[in-house]
Amino acid sequence: MLLGSHVSMSGKKMLEGSAIEAHEYGETTFMIYTGAPQNTRRKSIEDLNITKGHEVMEKYGLSNIVVHAPYIINIANTTKPETFNLGVDFLQQEIERTQAIGAKDIVLHPGAHVGAGVDAGINKIIEGLNEVLTNDNNVRIALETMAGKGTEIGRSFEELARIIDGVHNNERLSVCFDTCHTHDAGYNVKEDFDGVLNEFDKIIGVDRIKVVHVNDSKNDRGAQKDRHENIGFGYIGFDALNYIVHHDSFKDIPKILETPYVGEDKKNKKPPYKLEIEMLKQQQFDPELKNKVMQQ
């Protein structure tokens, strides 16, 4: 089963360090940012330590890794040309890094229309993706299902479908299905996941889903908040998330945890991924998980 989490990529070890961290959590795949998600400072491809990273991945059976584009990219912005242009240029660079790392998909938040309206935002995203996807490689951009916070685009399957339909080279577009986001956007992920998936299949096609973000939610369905919770401790619950992780439709695609670190003290938070992954593999909820994470 391809199950992993977001891991860090930093220091001198870069991809090698990411692979070691993922292995320590008992993962078979993982997701990384190529640098800080809040800025454009990036190391050169030569400094990403890719060869050693691949050696560690092969040693420990890690594959199908995923890259996440930084949050600062907003190609839905119609009011500031510099924001749009930065997004297009930087996304192209990130795709080059993604290809060098050997990942097939780079996850992208479609963007926010910042008050110009959904139609204007979608048209701008299409314009940006048409520009970006002229470059010659086989990396897919995985558009993420969004919670609908603020002016986010991608809160409904229909919005994502409109983007995909408008992009010329759309065989290079995939979808990242985020459980927390779709729940927060109003879809009944908890009680009727197969119904949600059938709806997705009719509107977009389930074969477009190439990444799943597995997150519980701190909020009730339809809250449009996007606040992740640890597996089984939120409003979606363990049974629904366990069902999704083991779903036949997602058998061969990476399932990535982005659940929050545990701990009241901001300086002493600990990653939950090792124990959350064990829990999902055993298909048994552990109500003591958070306490056990802090005792690690």
UniProtKB/Swiss-Prot annotation:
Membrane-traversing stretches: none
Top EC group: hydrolase
Chain sites annotated for binding Zn(2+) 3: 181, 226, 228
Keywords of the record: DNA damage, DNA repair, Endonuclease, Hydrolase, Metal-binding, Nuclease, Zinc
Cysteines paired by S-S bonds: none
Note accompanying the cofactor annotation: Binds 3 Zn(2+) ions.
InterPro entries hit by this protein: AP_endonuc_2, AP_endonuc_F2_Zn_BS, Xyl_isomerase-like_sf, Xyl_isomerase-like_TIM-brl
Keyword flag Hydrolase: yes
Disruption phenotype: No visible phenotype. Double cshB-nfo mutants are as cold-sensitive as the single cshB mutant.
GO MF annotation, one: DNA binding
GO annotation, biological process: base-excision repair
Residues engaged in binding Zn(2+) 1: 68, 109, 144
Cofactor(s) this protein requires: Zn(2+)
Reaction(s) this enzyme catalyzes, per UniProt: Endonucleolytic cleavage to 5'-phosphooligonucleotide end-products
Signal peptide extent: none
Ligand binding (Zn(2+) 2): 144, 178, 213, 258
Superkingdom to which the source organism belongs: Bacteria
Record EC number: 3.1.21.2
Function: Endonuclease IV plays a role in DNA repair. It cleaves phosphodiester bonds at apurinic or apyrimidinic (AP) sites, generating a 3'-hydroxyl group and a 5'-terminal sugar phosphate.
Family statement drawn from the similarity comment of this UniProt entry: Belongs to the AP endonuclease 2 family.
Protein name: Probable endonuclease 4
Originating species: Staphylococcus aureus (strain NCTC 8325 / PS 47)
